[in-house]
Amino acid sequence: MTTIVDSNLPVARPSWDHSRLESRIVHLGCGAFHRAHQALYTHHLLESTDSDWGICEVNLMPGNDRVLIENLKKQQLLYTVAEKGAESTELKIIGSMKEALHPEIDGCEGILNAMARPQTAIVSLTVTEKGYCADAASGQLDLNNPLIKHDLENPTAPKSAIGYIVEALRLRREKGLKAFTVMSCDNVRENGHVAKVAVLGLAQARDPQLAAWIEENVTFPCTMVDRIVPAATPETLQEIADQLGVYDPCAIACEPFRQWVIEDNFVNGRPDWDKVGAQFVADVVPFEMMKLRMLNGSHSFLAYLGYLGGYETIADTVTNPAYRKAAFALMMQEQAPTLSMPEGTDLNAYATLLIERFSNPSLRHRTWQIAMDGSQKLPQRLLDPVRLHLQNGGSWRHLALGVAGWMRYTQGVDEQGNAIDVVDPMLAEFQKINAQYQGADRVKALLGLSGIFADDLPQNADFVGAVTAAYQQLCERGARECVAAL
């Protein structure tokens, strides 16, 4: 079968000698985001310098994860990224991968050997929040998680990413090798800390001396990653195939914008990603908060109120000037005042850029997709800023409507009476509340979900009053009218 390796393409394949690459990075979780972000930065560095930092890709899950690894191997580890701007699309053939492994093909041993090689300097991860196997309440490693239980009983044949990291570090210690840096690239707050807690938690349960060695020898830098990479659909893949002239099953589409802020805390060397647009900083947290509140917060606001207003995508939603204006006001009037940024950070320019990114019609980022898992997202994106305004007396009416939009969305019925496919770990609780309550009583019942609202907000009369009023307005007047009235 013809692939991107042996076809005449309208775009250049990587021109450098692939044999110069060393597998210095082992990456766990070769999903769409990683391929459009970290692997692409690494590709640009190979393109513009004599860097030899290559990536050994690892997928751990069965099914699609394995198929992707097999497909990459059929294409000599090349794949296509389509950067879709509002006006045009730029295709790139990415060549930063040196190897691609899967336990069903290479065995646990093959993956552990790769991680324990002397040249492996960084083990990076995009395994989603679930992949860190943390207990939601304590933030510590959940020792009752089925994967973690398996890894404690079968330490040399792990299943979780955390299990692989701990066993690989044990092997390195045993061989007298230098440790590697563990670099989380997941869209999780203080992701380096989350990774460290998980790795040390498992190491401690296995062998306290190993945990002490890891604590002393391994670093866990935090990173802030940003790029909109919608899930690849058959339509997207076909569209890219039409432009390429050949089908690439590993292709992905994304927006042109990308950002990567990295805490400069590496134990065994690192690529000069700053030469191709990444930022190395001493503290990532201010940048994380900026993204979380301004980008993710306004994304959630637009997702709930956009879906209820009958819009399928974020780009569709911001074609309505009232939504566009409301999202910008939310960012600048209500989210920006809650941030403490390094000198020289232009939040107005950042908000303007975000509106431009949201307006990109070629991405088709669905409001329904962004509305998923709201119970997990709401506290960080919308509720923490509300707490600051309640303390400091700031205005937060856009935030109130955003929270009310989420409440209205979880009713599971849209403004036309059609069912909404609500995807959320707390769906059963929502359904129970929906069956018993409506109106202000429903708001009160939702506020009783302490996993979302904690104990403080339901006790705050200003919060309860504002959110209840916004919710009742939404039920009576609909989302479009409420957004226009802000």
UniProtKB/Swiss-Prot annotation:
Pathway of action: Carbohydrate metabolism; pentose and glucuronate interconversion
Coiled coil: none
Any GO BP: D-glucuronate catabolic process
The reaction(s) this protein catalyses: D-mannonate + NAD(+) = keto-D-fructuronate + NADH + H(+)
Residues the record lists as binding NAD(+): I25, V26, H27, L28, G29, C30, G31, A32, F33, H34, R35, A36
EC numbers for this chain: 1.1.1.57
Gene3D superfamilies according to UniProt: N-(1-d-carboxylethyl)-l-norvaline Dehydrogenase, domain 2, NAD(P)-binding Rossmann-like Domain
SUPFAM superfamilies reported in the protein's UniProt record: 6-phosphogluconate dehydrogenase C-terminal domain-like (SSF48179), NAD(P)-binding Rossmann-fold domains (SSF51735)
InterPro entries: 6-PGluconate_DH-like_C_sf, 6PGD_dom2, Mannitol_DH, Mannitol_DH/Oxidoreductase, Mannitol_DH_C, Mannitol_DH_CS, Mannitol_DH_N, NAD(P)-bd_dom_sf
Source superkingdom: Bacteria
GO molecular function: fructuronate reductase activity
UniProt KW keywords: NAD, Oxidoreductase
One Pfam match: Mannitol_dh_C
Family: Belongs to the mannitol dehydrogenase family. UxuB subfamily.
PANTHER family assigned: D-MANNONATE OXIDOREDUCTASE (PTHR43362:SF7), MANNITOL DEHYDROGENASE DSF1-RELATED (PTHR43362)
Name by which UniProt lists this protein: D-mannonate oxidoreductase
Annotated source species: Escherichia coli (strain K12)
